[in-house]
Structure formats: structure tokens, C-alpha cells
UniProtKB/Swiss-Prot annotation:
Boundaries of every Thioredoxin domain copy: 58-172
Summary of the function given for this chain in its UniProt record: Probable thiol-disulfide oxidoreductase that may be involved in the redox regulation of chloroplastic enzymes.
Disulphides: 96-99
Pfam families assigned to the protein according to its UniProt record, in alphabetical order: Thioredoxin
Coiled-coil residues: none
Localization annotation: Plastid, Chloroplast
Record: transit peptide: 1-57
Site (Contributes to redox potential value): 97-98
Name under which the protein is recorded: Thioredoxin M1, chloroplastic
Entry keywords, A to Z: Chloroplast, Disulfide bond, Electron transport, Plastid, Redox-active center, Transit peptide, Transport
Signal peptide positions on this chain: none
Gene Ontology MF term list: protein-disulfide reductase activity
Amino acid sequence: MASSALAVSVAKPAASPPVAVAAVTPQRRLLPQCRGVRAAPVVRLRSGRARGVSVVCAAQGQETSFQVPDVTKSTWQSLVVESELPVLVEFWASWCGPCKMIDPVIGKLSKEYEGKLNCYKLNTDENPDIATQFGIRSIPTMMIFKNGEKKDAVIGAVPESTLVSSIDKYIGR
């Protein structure tokens, strides 16, 4: 048997930065009330993990939400208990992701039900006494009060239709 020697010539690779960037073609998706999506490429780190696509939404300049006023321990009695209208209170915290998701819905409902329903937000981190008084264990929690009494509660970032059906029971639409 003849022995054959195979000589392989390998070029020495040039020095590269520690992070290699993989080229990606971003998909263009439209989000509601946005001009479009700008995507960042996927970046592969040495650990093998990848960062996802970064989505940036640019509002089209129209008013997208209504600022819901805050209620605190000091204003609770006058704004909620003594209100002549039914009151929707959103119990929330600044660090809560689902609270941020439901916030625009509460703002929209506040605007739609203006004159029929008062809407307020209560920060549970800043007002733990009231949150404890009403047994708040999950946020966001939306409670409806009528004549100063708790009538209904909806827990979690629910669809707008769920909140509307709860509200409509107490405002006589």
C-alpha cells in the first residue's frame, strides 16, 4: 500500500473582536399606532447566547392615552369613599410589567366613561395600608366602588372587554 501524505495549508485568521455579529434581515411588522419597527441585528456573544430583536415604536403624534389621576391614603376618603359616581381604582406598582400593559386601557376607559365613572390609580408601594385593607395580593387589580363600598374586583392585565362588562354592571349604561 502506498502511503499518501496530505498537506493542508491553513491561513492564520486575522484578529477579531470578542463579539461576532451575525447578519440578520429584520422583518418589518407594524404595531398599532406606530410608524413601524426598527430592528437591531442579533448579536452572538462568546457564551453562545443571542440577544433578540430590539423593537422601537414611534408614536404618530396622536394622543394615545389619558393620564389617570393618582389616589393616595390622604385623598382616599374624598375621592373614593365620598364619590357620588362609581369609582374604578387600579392598584399598581411602577416595577410591574402587566400594570404597564393595562395602564393605556384604564386611561382609555377613564376618557370614555368621563362623567359616569371616576378612575384613579393607587401605587401599592407608596400606599401599602390601603392595599392591605382591601387584600391586594396580585397587581394589577382593578376594583369598582359604588357609594363607598367595594362592588367588584378584576385581577390581572385583562382585555378591555372584561373591564367594560364589569363597569357596565354598576353605571347602568
